[in-house]
Amino acid sequence: MKATVRDLDGDDAGEVELPAVFETDYRPDLIKRAVLAAQANRIQDTGTDEYAGLRTPAESPGSGRGMAHVPRQNGRAREVPQAVSGRPAHPPKAEKDRGLDINTKERKLATRSAIAATANADRVEERGHEFDEETDLPLVVSDEFEDLVKTQEAVDVLEALGVYDDIERAEDGKTVRAGRGTTRGRKYTEPKSVLVVTSDDQSLAARNLAGSDVATADEVNVEDLAPGTQAGRLTLWTESALAEVAER
């Protein structure tokens, strides 16, 4: 199985033999498990103050008064979960293990399967990515792309390759997040667009494009390749990155 190598102008620059990893069977079940496990294992432990709701001089009136034994302060119930300012009934426990396990072989197979999905044009299109019909997948570009520094240079290359429409799609899809995250540094949500996989150093030029991510071939993971557990992300590989990903 071969792929066409494009230069920075979008012209043919030869062919390259694709590694065997691109022939891996599609395993959406393992991809989903691997992504969910990675997300779950990043969850920070959450707990509550053990004295929350108990900092009050309230006392129980005891028996023989024809009223409930709940602690009271100025005639009003305190401390119990059903009372105003009472303790939480079932608070989150810091010692709870929120992580998910996945076998090492399954995780590696999920990554290989997600890599192979980037070469399937139908699957990439089903995921919502936009690219020219003439664009061949997997999209391989010469190593000169790794030397680009300015964002505009990367924009010109992506336009020549016929995938810049996907960057614009992500930029137009940027919206204000619903919920509490807007006050916690996560104000906006943005669709994922092009993933750029390089060999050694991450390319600076494509790092600031809307929805794009940059990863090295030895560090790219199943979350990069299948955001939201959906495989088939539009991915740009440099020629050297293909050689390194063969070892995955």
UniProtKB/Swiss-Prot annotation:
PROSITE patterns attached to this UniProt entry: RIBOSOMAL_L1E
Pfam family, one: Ribosomal_L4
GO molecular function, one term: structural constituent of ribosome
GO CC terms of this entry: ribonucleoprotein complex; ribosome
Coiled-coil blocks: none
Biased composition (Basic and acidic residues): 92-109
Region (Disordered): 44-109
SUPFAM superfamilies: Ribosomal protein L4
Top-rank taxon: Archaea
One GO term (biological process): translation
Keywords from the named record: Ribonucleoprotein, Ribosomal protein, RNA-binding, rRNA-binding
Subunit-structure text: Part of the 50S ribosomal subunit.
Described function: One of the primary rRNA binding proteins, this protein initially binds near the 5'-end of the 23S rRNA. It is important during the early stages of 50S assembly. It makes multiple contacts with different domains of the 23S rRNA in the assembled 50S subunit and ribosome. Forms part of the polypeptide exit tunnel.
Family recorded in the similarity comment: Belongs to the universal ribosomal protein uL4 family.
The protein's name in its UniProt record: Large ribosomal subunit protein uL4
Organism: Natronomonas pharaonis (strain ATCC 35678 / DSM 2160 / CIP 103997 / JCM 8858 / NBRC 14720 / NCIMB 2260 / Gabara)
Organism phylogeny: Archaea, Methanobacteriati, Methanobacteriota, Stenosarchaea group, Halobacteria
